[in-house]
Amino acid sequence: MVPALSPSRAADFMQCPLLYRFRVVDRLPEPATPAMARGTLVHAVLERLFDLPAGGRTRDAAGELLPGQWTRMVDERPELSDLVDEADPARLQSWFDDALRLIERWFTLEDPTRLEPAERELYVETEIDGLILRGYVDRLDVAPDGRMRVVDYKTGRAPSHLFEGKALFQMKFYALVLWRLHGRVPTRLQLVYLGSGELLTYEPDEHDLRAVERKVKALWVAIERAATDGDFRPRPSRLCDWCGHKQLCPAFGGVAPPIPDDAVVLALDPRASGAVELVTAPPMAAGATDAEATADRRAPGSPRAGVVR
Ligand code: SF4
């Protein structure tokens, strides 16, 4: 099997090799959280809204899509019903109201009546020197002259300048894949933060994307080495507060499960290392951005990264 890497698993390993192990090797379950489910619901509504004619893409229309999309999600994953007491109309309404607040914030940032996305929830994949890179792009806008804008929705808050690079890694990863697929560097990468009502934009060039390519290749070498050595060390950081496996983490007094005999195979299994989710962000990342938003905003950001607040 050809090895594969998704931006989510790449980000896991960069954040903490033990987190990568818990997710890819041990495959520990991670119950859905309200933040994750709300993010998925909001994504679904923003995606479906573009099925409507341009003039009909209103706040009210988006609100009307919420119950149907929620029902579809629960049908597909019945365990989600544990997150919301649907027998209590007030709680159900409150759940939809929370999602609607995020959607309404989106309307302050973008005008869907003036957008015609070329693609929504676009699966992208390319192979670079024997490593498959894959992921889902929330939205791809293509201008008549071929310029591409890659858009990703985040239901958390925008990161501080200190963490913008981390937030943009995923977008540059997609830009690299699109560049390899179409022979053209996307003109703009745009992260839409619905939690704080901010846009983070970046205009990549070939130099950037070559650097991302080197980084991804080096990351895969590091993953292979960790798998061969069975050495997935914890890397504690403030993001540990959002780690669903903290109680098992030796850095916090826990005991990790014994590493499986076939850990090497599991760690490099492309179905896990290249796993992609149609979800806004794992719960840890969503919460992390909330925390990061309170970090030191005086830190210098990338010179071509722009935040519209
Ligand atoms: S708690 Fe922190 S150090 Fe431990 S596995 Fe999770 S992210 Fe890694």
What are the residue ranges of the model-derived segments?
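Metal-dependent nuclease catalytic regions and adjoining charged, substrate-binding loops involved
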Residues: A4, D145, V177-R309
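Short, polar/flexible loop-turn hinges at active-site or ligand-entry regions and domain interfaces
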Residues: D26-A35, D51-R57, S160-H161, D229-F232
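Solvent-exposed, amphipathic alpha-helical segments
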Residues: L41-L52, A222-A226
